[in-house]
């Protein structure tokens, strides 16, 4: 290669040497000029680069760069501003739409306000018109009632509410005999609250007491001791005459009339005295019910009326005292005749109402029937003038509760005529409760029990559909209970069969005795194949089951042959208890079988463990005896809930308990308290169950 190169170089040199003489001097000048121009251009380039570098490092250049950046940013800001303006214009349009909608709503609300005011004015006008119309109708009704000779308050009380006062769980009749005296309506002064003062300190004669309405206080059974005011016809009002204005302490119309009758009437003392005593009892009970707080509230509510009429109150008290001194026997005979006549009319109205409502009694509720019947009888007894005895009525709530308790507890019923007489003696009041007592006895008695109808109950045949309905319901319940009994029997058979198969599979090498497989319908145990000692065991179980059935309270119906009722006479609840007793018998028999099986298993397990661990130390024997004792204790616990007869028989028979010598006799454990606690008791181990599977 060097030679080549050298050779090459020598060739070029030869060419240049050969061509050098051919070049002219102008060529060299041209080359020199070009080289000089190249140097000058390079020099200028370097100068320009230096200037550019210096310019870039100067503040002016930086300012220009910043200005360019700011101009670019300004352009971006202007663009975003333009977009924001467009968006704001859209928002303004939307706001304008919302504003127009709100203005439309405000106009609508103004219209609604106008309509509201118009409607309120219309409602007020209608209320005033309704009040005026009600006042006119009340006045017309009162005038008609006065013309007919019947008090308007009593006429309203017959149709609107029940005139009864419930106090301390007792219902007392509050119908006043003022309904028989027709007087003029002179004033109608409503008051917010009123108090009841001494009934013997404000007696008036028939000439001065212009009473036009009876004061009947009604309270609910739920709030009989918590009411704050006395309600009269749904409102708190009291009607008195001009001579007896309303004050903070005013007498009810009923009390004034009855005090008048008690003080002045001697010829008709029987009827009027009984009514006066009822009124006295009513007001004494009301005085007890009205607590001091209620009295204070009444005084506060009526303070304005008392302050305005204080002078009138003083004059009224003086006037009453003067009339009290001059009170004499001035009651006319016409009052008694009108009283008897109105009582007969009232009784006739009640009988007609009873006949009209008798068709609905068969389809109504039993409680409503009893309440209506009791209410009618109380009103009839209160309005009649022939009775001279003071009778205290029993409240409807108490009667309903007693009847429900008697219906829901068939085990406490009395059979035959003795039970009927006892119930009649518990509910009797000579004439007042005879029909109701017979109705309750008919409802509570068995459907097929033979009883002669009472001559005092002409409406008794109307209640026969209830007996038929109860009979059909009893048959349905009986069929349902029989189906449940059959299901329980089949399930128990299945369970006993499975357990017997399981036990026989485990102890097939040690036992040849067959378990019972069939349960008889008479709640006893019937052996499929009696073998050896199983016969005596099952006989004992049957005796125990029958003894349990005789002793248990739920099976008293099946065990009492002297009641004189057939199986069809049983009510549904008694049928259910009968089937429940059968299921309990089967359960007790099953427990006895389980007890005998577990005891035999414990015996076999003990023998097997003793044979296997006879050569081991005390630990093995302890384990063996504890296992056997656990099984035995389970058996005794399962049989501890048996009948009392089985326990007594086990106490009478000689008992052989199973004890492990390794645990009780040869054990080194000195803890005697634990041994005493774990030691099985003698009366829990019957002697004839220990070799159940032995052949």
Curated annotation (Swiss-Prot):
Protein's recorded name: Centrosomal protein kizuna
Region Disordered, residue ranges: 1-24, 261-313, 351-391, 444-465, 633-695
Compartments, as annotated in UniProt: Cytoplasm, Cytoskeleton, Microtubule organizing center, Centrosome; Cytoplasm, Cytoskeleton, Cilium basal body
Gly residues compositional bias, start-end: 1-12
GO cellular component, one term: cell projection
Modified residues (Phosphoserine): 667, 670, 672
Organism whose genome encodes this protein: Mus musculus
Species classification: Eukaryota, Metazoa, Chordata, Craniata, Vertebrata
BP-aspect Gene Ontology terms: spindle organization
